Each structure stands twice: as C-alpha cells, then as structure tokens.
Swiss-Prot record:
It comes from the Eukaryota. The keyword Repeat applies. GO terms for cellular component: Pwp2p-containing subcomplex of 90S preribosome; small-subunit processome. This is Periodic tryptophan protein 2 homolog. The lineage of its organism: Eukaryota, Metazoa, Ecdysozoa, Nematoda, Chromadorea. InterPro entries: PWP2 (IPR027145), Quino_amine_DH_bsu (IPR011044), SSU_processome_Utp12 (IPR007148), WD40/YVTN_repeat-like_dom_sf (IPR015943), WD40_repeat_CS (IPR019775), WD40_repeat_dom_sf (IPR036322), WD40_rpt (IPR001680). Keywords: Repeat, WD repeat. Belongs to the WD repeat PWP2 family. WD repeats lie at residues 12-50, 53-92, 94-134, 144-183, 188-227, 271-310, 313-355, 358-397, 400-439, 443-485, 486-523, 525-563, 586-625, 688-728. Pfam families: Utp12, WD40. It comes from Caenorhabditis elegans. Residues 875-910 have a biased composition (Acidic residues).
C-alpha cells in the first residue's frame, strides 16, 4: 500500500501576487501562488507546482542566465535558492529586511538585492566557511536612500547597476571600485521609480516613474572605458578629467544627459489620471511595455517612443509584466488574491497564448470525472469551472447560477456535469456543446447543500439546507419524482449506491432510504453527522460526526463495525482573532469531510484544520498526516500566536502600527474581519484568511487526490518523479551496460537494466531503439515484474503523453498486453491499467481532432476545386455559345452581302 503522496499541482489558482518571470527558453511562465511556485509550460500545455516550503508569500523572482537556478524572496525578506532541474530548494538566507527587487548579474557570478533602503551585492559560489555550504557571500553594500528601493538592473558587462525607489531618484553605482564613479544620482521624475534599465551593450538608460514620465539618459562612457580604482571627489573648479602626476589625462568621470522625455500616460486612454504600476524594457527589440492601474498596457519603441500597440487586458490593476527571451510574448499578472488572473499575450499577432483566471471567491467543492482526465470545481462566486487534470488549465466556465455552488457531480459517462447551488436549482451542463441543457427546480424556494447522482445517470438527488427534505428528480425528463422527509435538522450529506440512499443530518441521525418504496431505516449517532459516504463496493458506510469520530456501519443491516477517533489528529491552530486558549478553541474544530479511495482500503479526512490525514479502513488506524501549507501569511498555520504580541490591549497583530503610506498599494491598511463573518476579500494584501479544508476527493485511478482549501485545490499524486529512484539496483547495472546491450541488439537486457536504474532517458532510448519487427519478441521475453514496471513507468512519466511516436508506443502497449494481459489482470494495480486507458484516450482525442480538421480541410479544398471547375466550365460554355453566335452573325452578314451583290448585278444587266 503506497502512501507516498506528494504535492504535484495546484488547480484553481494561477496567480496571487508578486512578480512573474519567463524561463530561459522563453516557453514557460513561473508564477507565484502564495508560498509556492507554479510553472506553466506553454509549449507542451502542462503545468506543475513547486512546493519549496516558504514561510510567507513569494513576492520577487529572478532566474539565472543559465536558466538552472531561481531566486525567490518572500514578504519577510527571506531568499530561497532553488534548482529548477531537480525542483529542489538548495539554500535559504535571510536579508532581515523586506526586499524590493533582486536580480542575477549577466555573468551569473553575483546577485544584487534591494534590501529596503540599501543595495547589497552578493558573490555566488565563493564562500564555504567552517565546512558549511554557503553559496552567497556579501561583497559590498550601498546605502542609497532613506526610502525603499523598488527596482534594479545590471549593465550587460556586469560593471554598473542602476536602482530607483520611492524617493524619485535614480542612482547608478559600480559593481566594483571604479575611478569613474561612486554613486551617481539622477533626479528628474515626478513619482516613484517603477522601472529603470540599461540598454543593450551600452550604459544608456531608460527610467519610468509612477506618474507616467519616461526619460532616456545617454552616458558619456562606453563599455570598456571604466577604470578600476578608488574614486576621488573632484575639487571645486576642477575638470571632470582626473590628471595623473605626470600630467597625462587618464580617467573621465561618468555623467548622464537626458536626451528624451515622454509622458506614457497619454497613450493609456485616460490621460494623466492613471498611474503606471509596472514597466519592462526588452533590450533586444528596444520595446518598452508599460502597464497602468486601469488594466491598460501599451508598447512603445525606444528611443523614439512611437506607439506600437495599445491593449486593455483587464478591468483590474496590472501588477507585473515580463518579456520572454525573444520579445514575442508578454506575461501579465492582473489583480490580487483570488481575483487575480494570468495572461500571456503575443503582441505581433495580437492573440492570447494563455489567459487563465481562478474563482473570485473560495472553492467549496471539487470532483474528478469518471476517467480522471477532468476536474470540476464550484465556488461561492456561483461559477463552475472545468479543469484539465493533465495540464491544469481551465477549459470552460459555467456561470448560470445566481448564488454559491455547494456541490458538483459527474454523470457516469462523463459527458455532463451537475451542480447544486444556494439559489435552489440543480443545473446540468453538456461538455460537448458547453451549454446548460437542463435545470432542476425545487417545488418551494430553498437552498440546496448536497448532491448525488446514481451510476446509471437516471436519478439526481439533492438535499435541502432549510426545509430538511431530500428531492429526487429524473435526469432524463427533469420531473420531480419524490420528496423524502424525516430529518429534523439540516441535512449535511447524502450518498447513493444502487437502490439505497444514505443521508446524514445535524439531528444526530443517519437514514438509509430505499428508492423503490421511499422507506427509511434510522440509526442514531452520538453527535451531529457532518459527512456520510458509501464505500466503492457499497458494503460499508462511513459516518463522520462533530466529535471527530468516524464510525463504520455494515450497509445491509446497519451494524456497527468499528470507529476511528480523529480528534487528536486534527491538531487545529489558534486563530489570531481567538480570545480563548488553543485547547478551548480545538474543542470546537474537527474534520468535516471524508472520502474513500477507489479500492475502499483508504479513507481521506480533512476539515477545520491545516492538517489532513489518510486512514486505513481495515486496520482502523492513521497511515499518514500532511500539512496543507506552511504559509504564515495565512491565519491558522502557527499552532499558537506569539505571546510577545499579546498585550493588555489585545493581539497587536490585529493593529496596524506601521506608518507606511505606499501609493502603489491602495487600501494598504490592516483588514480586520468583522464579528460573525466568515468571508471577506481574500485579495486584501494585509488580510490573513484562515486555513480550512472544504472538500476532499479521490481520483478514480487511486493515484491522486485533491484537497479544496483556502489556497485553492491542491493535487497530491504518487506519480511525482524524483531525480533518482532505482528499482532492484545492483553494482553491475550502469549506463555502460545499457549502451553495450543496445549496441549488441539485446534489447530486453537493456530495457531491464534501464528499469532498474529508473532513468527516463535510458528507458526511452532503449524502447525507441527497438525495431518494430522485434517489439513482440522483446515484450514476450520481459519477465512479468519488469513488464508491470514498464507499464507503471509509462503511466507515471511524461514520455507517453508528450511523445510524437504515438503509433510506435501503441505497438509496445499492444505487445505487452497481448503477452502479459492475463497475468496482469489479476496482478497489476488497477490504477496502472486505468492510467494506460487515460493515455490512450488522450491520444485518441488529439488524433481524432487532428483527423477531423484534416478531413474538413480536404473537403473544403475539394469543394473549392469543384466550384472552380464548374465556374470554368460555365465560362467555357458561355465562350462556346458566344463563338457560335458570332459564327451565325458572320454567316448572316455574308448571306446579306451576297444578296446585295446579286441585286446590283441585276441592275447592271438591266
């Protein structure tokens, strides 16, 4: 029983706040989502999430010129050094102050960090003190301003740095000691410095301020003209050229001349009433991208400031922009919190490469499709979104509900999704035409809180929140068939298996209903029932009560089979607004959701806590416990708040004691939740939403499960591939053995050795080196253990889903299943076979789509050719007709002329 589930992705969250960046190849966007990082591969249409365990929200990013390393800083000034290939955090160091910006040098040997009001330069990979790994060593610090610094940039030769911030002054400093300059200030702006960058292979600069003023500065020195040494201040009346003792002119001091000024806000469409929120200059194409707080982004060519493009991306404020390597794509982060969206725009073709937006309010429910390829989510904003499980991109959004969505369910065929809402309706949406084709309405206005669909797809069951009734509709006709009443309090959960419906209520009872005769068997429980679920086989029922106890009943006779006490596993934290002790607060919090695994041996539980647990059903014991997040920017992560923050006036964390008046951050004051409220704007920068789990769901393959929490939908999977995970490895298995076996055409030995190393590159080479004629022979010679391992590798890896050799791998699959199918049927994990089915369905969908497009294109070409032929034929016929008419006219004319001649001859005779 494998329980090594690891975080693989976050669905429903694409961008929260902070800086976005492109990868070195320019095809992937790295976006911060809270204390994690999501990488969106735009070329392969996939995404993944790096869980680097930051304690606070990530704000600033910088990728090394090699593309292998990433620096990420959080709200508290902690810098995380991440290796992107292994997706592992290597090192962490504290700057002890908030970081406004950080950037690698072009030669990747130094890192510049704007640490509040000073600039630090760290050398990379030179310091190992006391045999302790320390990749960054501080080389120099510049005290530049009394206000915070916001932006920084290196020159292409890595000798100069330019920085600007809230004091409206741009300063140029040297990365080393130069005789030409020390700190050179440039003051010519009306607002905060939003961006300042050097131009390509030059010391010329462009600077942009918040008020929309852009300046182009020309430097008197070129790269290579800086002289190392100690800078000395010139005396009054002296020239800018330093004289050596022998009288030779040697060093020329640096200065900048403002050669161009332009008001960027004139291109925003709203005049000077809008402010610049982000700007980025692409050095290769000399194009400046400027974003405003009204959602408009404009492109100008530098230094002429010719308007290239103007686009309104969103109605929300644009937080960040980033260019890719070639300057073709522009990544744009809009909004904050749960209302944020991420856009990748190709400005030359004026088209969206990617445009994703999460739910605007918290996600309350999620459900996998029967084949596990899609996931449906419902939120309090009344929208239902369908996400692709493999790419984590939203494919369609349904917004017909007028109130919050409480439950979503798939039909067994996976062609329709049903959603229950607080508006009192159940809506069915077709995933082929993307329309709401049926609406089920209650006979009286009430709020629906639960939903269930039978496997045949004939019945739809929903539980009311106010009138304590269960409604049964016919899915085919939409007619109300029956109303089940009997509960005396709110119905918390319902589930269906076969002809039986089980319901749990706050009246401390669970009822087993028979659909045929509408009769119910009532079983009393010790506390309020919060959730109730059938096992996949239908022979067992699990009931979660408010005291944290999961009780198991035999489905037919309702006999108590045992229980699991989860109270100690909940381990809830004390909220910053709680006025009682942590022990007293823990008594009111418990798990609220449970879900069986597809094989029925595991039970997943989560609720009013930062923790969720996996239990063994046969053993009635806990197997593993996870923490949903370590983000201390959220409330409920730390078990108890710091006593030093608790005074006679209460918790000082709830009091805004700062004197910060950041004009770039509107509504910058502390957001305090009103008494009795559960929801508030999660986009508030200083708000601390409380961590809770609203839903847990298992993928039908059994290799993934999803957790709906305050941070979105977190997907945990067994298919996360580590860099080195060998299988039955011995000392004689190495790369040379594999290469030698492939060279000798011993493909079965090579495949078994590569499977023992579990190296994806070697396995792919061995498989693709095998000729098609020998695939059946090699597949039959593989032992059953290695055949099963090969199938598992195909499911877990990305080779099968992204390969171009689809037919080749289908031949491999057919050969393995033909020779080992009977043994695998009783031996292999069901999840492996289900994963193979998903991969085949994935390729079938893409090939069918491509074939249909080609077929339609060919039909169109044939029709065009036929129409051209018919037009040409008609033209030829018209020409023939015209030729015949011309011939007739000629004959008539000739006949007429003959008559005239005969008449003339007669007259002459006469």
């Amino acid at each position: 029983m494998d329980t090594n589930f690891k975080l693989s992705n976050c669905i429903g969250t694409v961008y929260r706040d902070g800086q976005v960046a492109f990868s070195k190849d320019g095809y992937s966007v790295i976006s911060p989502i809270g204390n994690k990082l999501s990488i969106f591969d735009l070329r392969n249409n996939t995404s993944k999430t790096l869980d680097i365990d930051c304690n606070y929200n990530i704000k600033r990013l910088s990728i090394s010129p090699s593309g292998y390393h990433l620096l990420a800083s959080d709200e508290r000034g902690v810098v995380h050094f991440v290796h992107l290939l292994s997706e592992f955090k290597i090192y962490t160091f504290r700057s002890n102050k908030p970081i406004g910006s950080l950037q690698w040098s072009p030669d990747a040997t130094r890192v510049a960090i704007c640490r509040e009001n000073d600039l630090q330069i760290h050398e990379f990979g030179k310091s190992i003190e006391n045999k302790v790994y320390n990749p960054f060593s501080l080389s120099r610090t510049y005290k530049l301003s009394s206000d915070s610094l916001k932006t920084i940039d290196w020159s292409d030769d890595a000798n100069l740095l330019v920085s600007g911030g809230e004091d409206r002054v741009v300063r140029v400093v040297g990365a080393k000691d130069f005789k030409n300059l020390f700190i050179h200030p440039l003051a010519s702006h009306k607002g905060y410095i939003v961006n300042c960058q050097f131009m390509k292979n030059s010391y010329d600069m462009i600077t942009v301020c918040k008020r929309g003023l852009a300046n182009v500065w020309t430097c008197n020195l070129r790269p290579g003209e800086l002289v190392e040494g100690i800078w000395k201040k010139d005396e009054e009346g002296s020239d800018d050229i330093e004289m050596l003792e022998d009288g030779e002119q040697k060093v020329e001091k640096i200065f900048f001349e403002k050669t161009k000024k332009y008001w960027l806000s004139e291109s925003s469409g709203s005049g000077k009433s809008v402010d610049v929120t982000a700007a980025r200059f692409h050095k290769e194409t000399n194009i400046l991208a400027t974003a405003f707080n009204n959602g408009v982004i404009v492109l100008h060519e530098i230094p002429s400031f010719a308007l290239v493009h103007n686009l309104r991306v969103s109605e929300m404020r644009i937080q960040t922009v980033a260019w890719n390597l070639t300057g073709d794509w522009l990544a744009i982060g809009c909004g904050k919190g749960s209302t944020a969206q991420l856009v990748v725009w190709e400005w030359q073709s004026e088209s969206y490469v990617m445009k994703q937006q999460a739910h605007s309010l918290r996600i309350t429910t999620a459900e996998y499709s029967p084949d596990g390829s899609l996931m449906a989510t419902g939120a309090e904003d009344g929208k239902v979104k369908i996400w692709n499980s493999r790419s984590s991109f939203c494919t369609v959004t349904f917004d017909e509900h007028t109130s919050g969505v409480t439950a979503v369910k798939w039909t067994q065929s996976g062609r329709a999704i049903l959603s229950a809402s607080l508006d009192g309706t159940v809506r069915a949406h077709d995933l082929k035409r993307y329309r709401n084709f049926r609406t089920l309405v209650c006979p009286e206005p009430t709020q629906l809180a639960t939903l269930a669909v039978d496997k045949a797809g004939d019945l739809v069951i929903a539980g009311a929140k106010e009138v304590f009734n269960i409604y049964i509709w016919s899915f085919e006709t939409g007619h109300l068939l029956d109303i089940l009443s009997g509960h005396e309090s709110a119905i918390s959960s319902i589930d269906i298996h076969g002809n039986h419906i089980v319901s749990g209520s706050w009246d401390r009872t669970i009822k087993m209903w028979t659909i045929v005769d509408s009769q119910a068997e009532t079983v009393e429980v010790s506390h309020e029932a919060l959730d109730v679920k059938f096992s996949p086989a239908g022979d067992e029922i699990a009931v979660l009560t408010s005291d944290g106890v999961i009780t198991f009943f035999e489905a037919k006779e309702m006999i108590n089979l045992g229980s699991i006490d989860t109270k100690l596993d909940t381990d809830p934290a004390r909220g910053s607004r709680d006025t009682i002790t942590r022990q007293s607060a823990a008594k009111t919090k418990t798990f609220t959701r449970i879900r069986f695994s597809p094989d029925g041996n595991l039970l997943l539980a989560g609720g009013e806590s930062n923790n969720f647990c996996l239990y063994s059903v046969p053993e009635r014991m806990i197997l593993k416990k996870w923490q949903i997040t370590a983000n201390r920017s959220l409330d409920g992560v730390i078990l108890d708040f710091n006593r030093r923050n608790f005074t006679e006036f209460g918790n000082m964390q709830l009091v805004d004691t700062s004197d910060e008046e950041d004009e770039l951050e509107p509504n910058n004051k502390m957001s305090i939740k009103l008494p009795g409220t559960k929801n508030f704007d999660l986009g508030e920068r200083r708000a601390r939403p409380e961590v809770n789990i609203y839903e847990v769901t298992y993928c039908p393959t059994g290799r993934r499960f999803a957790i709906c929490s305050t941070e979105g939908v977190s997907v945990y999977s067994l298919d996360t591939i580590s860099m080195f995970d060998p299988f039955q490895l011995d000392s004689q298995t190495n790369a040379e053995v594999i290469k030698r076996a492939v060279w000798n055409n011993d493909y079965s030995t090579a495949i078994m050795a590569s499977l023992r190393l579990n190296n994806a590159q070697y396995i792919t080479e061995c498989l693709e080196s095998t000729s098609i004629s020998q695939i059946p022979l090699v597949a039959s010679s593989l032992p059953l253990m290695y055949a099963e391992r090969l199938l598992k590798w195909m499911v877990e890896g990305n080779v099968m889903s992204s390969t171009r050799h689809v037919h080749f791998y289908m031949i491999w699959l057919r050969a393995i299943l033909q020779h080992h199918g009977m043994q695998l049927k009783g031996r292999a994990d069901v999840a492996t076979l289900t994963g193979i089915q998903q991969i085949v369905a994935h390729h079938q969908q893409h090939i069918t789509k491509l074939a249909n497009q080609n077929k339609f294109a060919l039909n169109w070409l044939v029709k065009i050719r036929q129409s051209k032929k018919s037009v040409k034929k008609e033209e030829e016929e018209e020409e023939d007709v015209s030729d015949e008419s011309d011939d007739e006219d000629i004959e008539d004319e000739s006949a007429g002329s003959d008559d005239e001649d005969s008449d003339d001859s007669v007259e002459i005779i006469e």
